[in-house]
Each structure stands twice: as structure tokens, then as C-alpha cells.
């Protein structure tokens, strides 16, 4: 069995926006850096000097997700593009439907089930911080705000820029990578390995 790295699940307790060039994470924010507004908006990724990725030559686009299937889309992207696996998104959808008696294409993946669902396919560990995770070649499954009430949208942080501090993530709904301050993310799931 070949083991690969991916990172998973510890909720971030606050969001902050900071000035400067450091990645904005709870473990490196001083009170002087905290702003009253989140001032960083995601921008479409474009290659820059200082980009660091979990894998070199990672595709910056992907197939657009099926509605409500951001989690399973990101799982397929992580397995196939980051780790070189071959699992089709349909396998994740079928497993979730049979195990949790719920169709993720209608209901999405419940926050109550996301941890056991992801850990069935990926070996996970506690989130530390984005820079350390990416430097260790561990992508970070995380969430951003959703326009759907009482829900979040799942994305995969796959890099950062060492000059600007921006986190780089794949968004399955938009089917391409974006750059943003890491304070934009809602929660972090350290995915350390995939199981095959």
C-alpha cells in the first residue's frame, strides 16, 4: 500500500486580517496585526516568483464540480492530482450515499460526517499551520464562506507565496486556483495520506 500525505480537521476559532507579508494564521498573529475588517479578497491565481506548492507542476485548473459536491470534487483532485492516485469522484459519492444514507449531490456532505468520511479515504493529522503543512508536502482541506445559508464551501490549500504570504488554493466550484490571505479560510483539515 502506497501512503501519501494530506492534512485534516481542527476548526479555526477566529478569522483575522493582518498587514504585512506573513501567512495569516492563529499561531503567528499578534494583537498589533489584527484588523477590524477582513480586507483580503480571493484573486485568480497567476504564477509569481516565490510560489511554493505541495507538488511541482500541479494543475491550476480542474473539472468544475457537480452542484453540492465540493467535498468529493476536492477529494478526487487531491487523490489524483496531488498524490497521483486514480480514484474517481463517483467512488466517494457512492461510499457517502451508502454509509450515511444521504445523497451528497442533493444535500452536500454534512459537517457531522465530514471527518469520518474523509478519514475513511485519507489518513489525517491535526492542523498546525499552512506554511508548515505545504513545506511538508501536505495539502490542507479547508472551507470558505458559501452563499448557501448554514453551509461552507470546501477547497484545498495547495501552496503559498513566500514573498506575499498569500495562500494558494483550488476552488472546485470555480474550477481553478485562487490566492488569498489565509485568514479567509473558515476551518482546516490536515490531510496527511491517502489510502489505496
What are the roles of these predicted feature ranges?
Residues 2-9:
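Sec-dependent signal peptide recognition
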Residues 3, 25-26, 169:
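Intrinsically disordered, low-complexity peptide-like regions
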Residues 9-10, 86:
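Intrinsically disordered, low-complexity segments enriched in polar/charged small residues
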Residues 10-11, 19, 27, 115:
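Generic low-complexity, intrinsically disordered sequence content enriched
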Residues 18-103, 146-148, 163:
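Active-site-adjacent structural segments surrounding the nucleophilic cysteine of cysteine proteases
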Residues 79-81, 90-196:
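Conserved active-site-adjacent core of cysteine acyl-enzyme catalytic domains
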Amino acid at each position: 500500500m502506497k501512503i501519501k500525505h494530506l492534512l485534516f480537521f481542527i476548526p479555526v476559532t477566529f478569522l483575522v486580517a493582518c498587514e504585512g507579508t506573513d501567512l495569516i494564521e492563529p499561531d503567528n498573529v499578534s494583537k498589533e496585526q489584527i484588523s477590524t475588517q477582513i480586507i483580503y479578497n480571493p484573486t485568480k491565481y497567476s504564477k509569481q516568483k516565490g510560489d511554493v506548492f505541495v507538488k511541482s507542476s500541479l494543475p491550476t485548473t480542474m473539472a468544475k464540480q457537480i452542484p453540492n459536491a465540493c467535498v468529493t470534487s476536492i477529494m478526487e483532485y487531491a487523490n489524483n492530482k496531488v498524490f497521483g492516485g486514480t480514484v474517481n469522484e463517483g467512488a466517494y459519492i457512492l461510499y457517502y450515499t451508502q454509509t450515511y444514507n444521504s445523497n451528497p449531490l442533493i444535500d452536500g456532505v454534512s459537517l457531522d460526517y465530514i471527518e469520518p468520511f474523509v478519514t475513511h479515504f485519507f489518513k489525517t493529522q491535526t492542523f498546525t499551520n499552512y506554511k508548515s503543512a505545504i513545506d511538508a508536502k501536505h495539502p490542507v482541506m479547508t472551507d470558505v464562506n458559501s452563499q448557501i445559508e448554514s453551509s461552507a464551501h470546501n477547497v484545498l490549500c495547495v501552496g503559498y507565496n513566500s514573498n506575499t504570504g498569500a495562500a494558494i488554493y483550488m476552488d472546485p466550484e470555480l474550477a481553478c486556483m485562487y490566492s488569498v490571505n489565509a485568514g479567509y479560510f473558515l476551518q482546516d483539515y490536515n490531510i496527511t495520506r491517502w489510502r489505496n
